[in-house]
């Protein structure tokens, strides 16, 4: 049985381009982001991959990325679940702020701690640990059972919500996961064993 799970971070958004903390705010993709999502779809198609089921967040940039990928695959009607549990980390009071302006206001070191520590949250927001605590139960209850049932599964989400999944799949620690970068629009192709551990992982090279 092929237990396929593909993870993809959304393409570049308007606020990525403007260097803003985005979190639960809802900007759409830039032209570059649209191109990244389409390239991801073409790359998956070139590998002969198709999907039985899809999951994405409640935010436009992830939903748009998924729609473009499925369009390139010629399968726009794949059953799709849109779930708030897969949303990006909530940056609280940082949301909508330019990252350089935030560094000027709070200091470079403090902003770095908020962005790259595991369990320290910005004012009014979530830590990465908080994000993991809402993403992983949803993965275990809804996504993983589909994969283990042999349904070819794609998840289009966000840098931090996907970090939570990669942390479990790759066996990373709370110390190492915050510094791991996920490129926009680049699929991670996993195949799982029946016990849910990873049999193989491929980062799909595009272009």
Swiss-Prot record:
According to UniProt, the reaction catalysed is:
(2R)-2-phosphoglycerate = (2R)-3-phosphoglycerate
Q: What is its EC number?
A: 5.4.2.11
Quote the SMART domains the UniProt record gives: PGAM
Q: Which Gene3D superfamilies match?
A: Phosphoglycerate mutase-like
Coiled-coil features, chain-numbered ranges: none
Residues forming the catalytic site? 10 (tele-phosphohistidine intermediate), 88 (proton donor/acceptor)
Pfam families from the entry? His_Phos_1
* Protein purpose: Catalyzes the interconversion of 2-phosphoglycerate and 3-phosphoglycerate.
Family listed: Belongs to the phosphoglycerate mutase family. BPG-dependent PGAM subfamily.
Give the protein name, as stated in the record: 2,3-bisphosphoglycerate-dependent phosphoglycerate mutase
User: What gene does the UniProt entry assign to this protein?
Assistant: gpmA
């Amino acid at each position: 049985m092929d237990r396929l799970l593909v993870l993809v971070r959304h393409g570049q958004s308007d606020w990525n381009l403007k260097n803003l903390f985005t979190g639960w705010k809802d900007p759409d993709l830039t032209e570059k982001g649209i191109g990244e999502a389409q390239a991801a779809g073409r790359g998956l198609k070139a590998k002969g991959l198709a999907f039985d089921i899809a999951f994405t967040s409640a935010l436009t940039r992830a939903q748009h990325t998924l729609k473009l990928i499925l369009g390139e695959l010629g399968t726009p009607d794949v059953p799709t679940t849109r779930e708030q549990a897969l949303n990006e980390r909530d940056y609280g009071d940082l949301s909508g702020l330019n990252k350089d302006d935030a560094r000027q206001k709070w200091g470079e070191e403090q902003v770095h701690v908020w962005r790259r520590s595991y369990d320290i949250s910005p004012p009014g927001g979530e830590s990465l640990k908080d994000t993991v605590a809402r993403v992983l139960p949803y993965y275990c209850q809804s996504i993983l059972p589909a994969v283990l049932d042999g349904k070819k599964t794609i998840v289009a989400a966000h840098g931090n919500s996907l970090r939570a999944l990669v942390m479990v799949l790759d066996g990373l620690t709370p110390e190492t996961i915050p510094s791991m970068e996920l490129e926009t629009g680049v699929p991670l192709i996993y195949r799982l064993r029946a016990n849910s551990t990873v049999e193989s992982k491929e980062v799909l090279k595009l272009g």
